[in-house]
Amino acid sequence: MMRQTNRGAGLLAVLCGTLAVAAVAARPAGAAERPYRNFSVAVYIPVNSTRQLANPQTLRRQFQRIWSQVHFDKVYLEVYRDQVFANPASLDRIAAFFRRRGITVDGGITLFAGRNKYNQYNSFDFENPRDVAICERAVRMAARHFNTIILDDFTFFNTRSNADIRAKGQLSWTRYRLRKMRWVAKHLIIGAARKVNPRVKVIIKYPNWYEHFQGLGFDLDREAKMFSGIYTGDETRDPVHTAQMLQQYESYLIYRYYHNIRPHADKGGWVDTFGDRYVDRYAEQLWDTLFAKAPEITLFSWPQLAVPEPVSPGERYAWAADRTSFDWNAMVRSFKAPPGTEAVPGWAQVAGYALGQVDTFLGKLGRPIGIASYKPFQSSGEDFLQNYLGNIGIPINLVPHFPADAPVVLLTEEAAADPQLVQKIEARLKAGGDVIITSGLLHALERAHRGIRNVAAITYTGLPIAVRHYLGSISGGATAGLNVPAERAKRVIFPQIRFYTNDSWPVIQGEAAAHGVPILLMSGYSRGQLYVLNVPSNMGDLYRLPEPVLNTLRGYLLARFPVRINAPAHVALFAYNNNTFIVESYLPRPVTVRVFVHHGARELLDLRSLEQVLPAPIVTPSPLPSEQGQTSFVVRLAPHSYRAFAIR
């Protein structure tokens, strides 16, 4: 049940937000005030554009095209990329143009050697004197003109030349590249820059493939601390139709992870316009980065924002008639063409509209919170699993050190890189905490004979079981079906896990031909609970689990969390430490979400519309202990939309 009060105030707030976006678009070029209260905006200018902007007419025309659509506080002016250098004589003149308009100008470098004959990325070969000389020249040029430099995310090492092979010797490629890139950071980049400009600050941008960094010399441990700051590559693009298949939740999680590595030194998040089948996807990446509380958003890049062609809505036919968070028609209406032009809205207008919208409430959100998940430095295993879990409504806080004080700890296979992990698990359980380990971690610890059976007599066999039917434990051995009535569930393959009856409890299990496989096992140890989460052989099949299975899974894993949702897959929950939260749907259809919060909550206040949502009690009692004594609300989400709430 919902009721809306103070409707006029709600409509006024929405209208003001729309007018604010329009005002940004119409602001004259000389204005220096910041319309965004909760973040700043930067635009990255690649070197080919830097060379074009040496022409004053081109600079004025392209600037006006972008500025009429989105306000920005800073530009990163690139001096080198892909064997191309900027003209040093033009850099100061271009920088002066922006500074006269109150826009900060920093330098940029992309240490990218180009593509090989197979169209694959080539890093510099740091054993090749020619590449070393180019690197030093680019760094010196940037330091000569700018006091702050950002490195785009190609500062890695992927060549295997004969010189590299000789230098590697008996080391693994990972150890060799990590050692070499620490030397490169210290001497060829930071050292070379400070010889030219002792005051220069160098920021390194780390990309979105963090699970594989160590294999190419990216080092979030020691190298990241050498630089004045770090930056987050939040580009996730399309989650299915791109080579990386990065899930939407990563745009949020990766910023939180890098922030946890260097608190207050992660300068912002970076999003591009590439690989999106529908325009809403670009807005979602911007929003999710800012939901993670990034202080700056960098728009990559200048040429995509400056093109005179209109932006296309893309493949959004299924929800074109819905009132979605990214309202295409409202975005188009908010565009104000510069006087005397026939300009049309482009990518910059999409960014301006999306950014102006969330700025109205971001300041009301507290510090992001989530289930602590431990990823040791230089680790991999069950790669990117936390992002899939985020996409099924489990908030994650990815951290580089074991969270010894967290009430609940999630450990995936990559945590096996910590040789003291089992002892830390035991200590957390003895202190009364809950520890969730995945089937991949269970298998890794068993292979390494790390003593996990001292905690629970649970064994990974790996035998594949194709599951279509699901059951939840009630009491006394009784079960309840977790399939959706009249819906034929798709088969999901799980590895078999053995356990002793009445020693561990399969609170969720799959059934196949009168044979069961545990999906969530629960086992008591000292004062805590150990859970084993069985991950499908294809982790993307988490999205195929029926909604009752996902609801039950969240009910156990989030039993100690202040907010929880019942929802299908592809609905994310972002929570904060001041009784605020966001629910966001990546689905192409409307969805109804039930939200559970603490007992005694009177209402949810929508932070955008000011609508008040009243409690909606569950008619059928749930067997889940986490639902006892909680207050629930029903929230409706349009396709590809979010809603932000305060609990009151």
Q: Which sequence ranges carry the predicted segments?
A:
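Bacterial N-terminal signal peptides
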Residues: 10-23
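Boundary at the C-terminal end of the N-terminal hydrophobic targeting segment
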Residues: 22-31
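A short, well-structured beta->alpha microelement
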Residues: 56-64, 385-406, 413-416
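Active-site-adjacent "subsite" loops/lids of carbohydrate-active enzymes
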Residues: 34-60, 92-100, 104-147, 153, ...
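A conserved amphipathic helix/loop scaffold
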Residues: 400, 412-648
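Acidic (Asp/Glu)-rich catalytic clusters
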Residues: 62-69, 91-102, 143, 220-225, ...
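Short, acidic/polar
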Residues: 51-69, 128-142, 212-223, 279-289
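Hydrophobic targeting/anchoring helices
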Residues: 46, 78, 118-120, 147, ...
